[in-house]
């Protein structure tokens, strides 16, 4: 039985990761920021941890909540979205919300969680996956749609790639879920939540040291550029 940690699991992709890993017989620890989200996690049989990734004080206490754990697979799924383009200056509130959740939360989690992932499999190490977006790919930008969101996810990719050398036993990747039918992706998206998460789970199982620090699609294939 593997130990799986899902950070940002109250709904959508995060909740589906919890559902699928629990169905596979894995032990799952998962975070949510409110009571309703925590109850959804408990209903799936997960160990629910209260955490608000947009609040640095909340994230700073993650390590003691995970004390003694060895994590085979950790996933940072938490994220917020904005559609605003470059024709409108981002507000301070919008910028701070996206950067705190999408970037700072992940950067705070890495030093607390990565050492626990390194201890997995009798010290051989596990996998730490950060859910990013294809909209972060600088080499294929065709629009400023989601301007601040794009910037935040590109920053997340760099946070992952630059943290990787400090944790040689851990395979750290930034993985896009694809265009998914969630509150963020909309009803017209190509993939259901179930399809996206199933594909990502297969890709995660197939990760090897050659993938360290990589920017991957939901099927595990690398993007053509950063």
Language-model features: where?
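Conserved Rossmann-fold cofactor-binding substructure of NAD(P)-dependent oxidoreductases
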Residues: 53-69
């Amino acid at each position: 039985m593997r130990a799986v940690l899902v950070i940002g699991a109250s709904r959508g992709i995060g909740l589906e990761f919890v559902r699928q890993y629990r169905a596979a017989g894995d032990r799952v620890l998962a975070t949510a920021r409110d009571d309703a989200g925590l109850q959804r996690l408990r209903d799936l049989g997960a160990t629910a941890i209260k955490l608000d990734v947009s609040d640095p004080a909340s994230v700073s206490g993650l390590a003691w909540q995970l004390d003694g754990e060895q994590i085979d697979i950790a996933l940072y799924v938490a994220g917020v979205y904005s559609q605003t383009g470059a024709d409108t200056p981002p507000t301070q509130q919008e910028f701070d919300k996206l950067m705190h959740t999408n970037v700072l939360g992940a950067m705070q989690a890495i030093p607390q969680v990565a050492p626990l992932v390194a201890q997995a499999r009798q010290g051989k190490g596990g996998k730490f996956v950060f859910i990013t977006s294809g909209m972060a790919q600088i080499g294929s930008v065709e629009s400023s749609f989601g301007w601040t969101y794009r910037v935040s996810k590109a920053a997340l990719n760099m946070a992952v790639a630059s943290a990787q050398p400090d944790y040689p036993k851990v395979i750290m990747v930034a993985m896009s879920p694809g265009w998914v039918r969630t509150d963020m992706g909309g009803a017209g998206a190509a993939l259901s939540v179930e399809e996206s998460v199933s594909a990502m789970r297969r890709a995660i199982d197939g990760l090897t040291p050659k993938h360290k620090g990589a920017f991957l699609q939901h099927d595990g294939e690398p993007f053509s550029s950063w």
